[in-house]
Amino acid sequence: MSSYDVIEYWNKRDNPNSKNPNERNTLKHISFVKENIRLNDKILDYGPGIGRILPAYTENNKVTGYDVSSKYKERLLETAKQRKIELNLIIDKAILTEFSFNNNEFDAVVSISVLLHQPPKDIVNIMCELARVATKVVIVSWHNPTIPYDSSDVRPDDSKFCFNHDYKEICKENNLKIDSWQYDNEAKQIYFVYRHD
């Protein structure tokens, strides 16, 4: 992969989030999501991948998954079935910075370890659209305040593309209100909830 293509990246990535630190972090992610959704919430899971966040949801939640890759579709649907979660999965192979959902169609958008993979040219539109379609947006993302914003963390083998976005500034400049903000220095992850102001 000579340049970064989000869809190609996910179609080629095997066993995402399978290393030990990610297993430990997943429990923190699930807990954070549970703290920020209600029993009967209608949820948009933006980038559900293999379904590692599904344990945060209950049978009563109405969950729509939105992903750009079908690589993990069967694994995701099987996990949802095992957890008795009715999941409406939308696979859209075009990178959309404008969604077809209605304003406030969802009670919450949940997006865990997804925004960090969105290129700087798309991040503002994506964050604004997520806030448009739900009353609140629940995010966990890689964040390293010691490196320049909108730079990427790229290994020589091109197996990882992570962008360090200035989420506070994006929210400020786009009338998005941050309701909670927590930083995990050890994991270099930000946990935050935002909405339209």
Predicted regions and their residues:
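Short glycine-dipeptide loop
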Residues: 134-138
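Short amphipathic alpha-helix with an adjacent loop that forms part of the alpha/beta core around
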Residues: 98-104
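A conserved beta-strand element that flanks and buttresses the S-adenosyl-L-methionine
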Residues: 110
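Structured loop/turn residues at beta-strand edges in well-structured enzyme cores
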Residues: 38, 104, 132-133
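Short catalytic micro-motifs in class I SAM-dependent methyltransferases
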Residues: 113-117
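Class I (Rossmann-like) S-adenosyl-L-methionine-dependent methyltransferase catalytic domain
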Residues: 1-40, 46-98, 118-125, 129, ...
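Acidic donor-binding loop of glycosyltransferase active sites
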Residues: 107
